[in-house]
Amino acid sequence: MPDKSQELPRNPTLGEVFSVISGLCMVSDFHKNIRIKVMGTLFLPPIQLNQFRIWYDKDGPTGFVVWAFLSEEVAERYKNGIPVQPHEWQSGKNLWFINFVSIRGSLKEKIR
């Protein structure tokens, strides 16, 4: 069971959520070289739309996921390496998990 002092407040600010997510990125081998400006582009739209989840254990945050609901057109562009634009995060009905970080624990236990 997580230590509640390690979790975000009930109604966290955009800055509080972004701080946790960017902190997790900084210790992720895959994400640690992403510039903060790029992190903003990747993570602020889903945070603003409440399309994220952060996991915690007794030592603090352990991972997060952000998702989008993409139109067919946006999904095709995304599959071809074109990033989702801020106005496209809710462009359709197709659920896409855009980014996932897990620094402790298995991915399998997080997605249950």
Predicted regions and their residues:
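Context-gated lysine
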Residues: 4, 32, 37, 58, ...
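Helix N-terminus capping/helix-initiation residues
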Residues: 35, 70-71
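Short amphipathic alpha-helix that is part of the acyltransferase structural core
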Residues: 1-39
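Conserved beta-hairpin
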Residues: 47-64, 68-69
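Short secondary-structure capping micro-motifs at structural edges
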Residues: 38-44, 50-54, 80-87
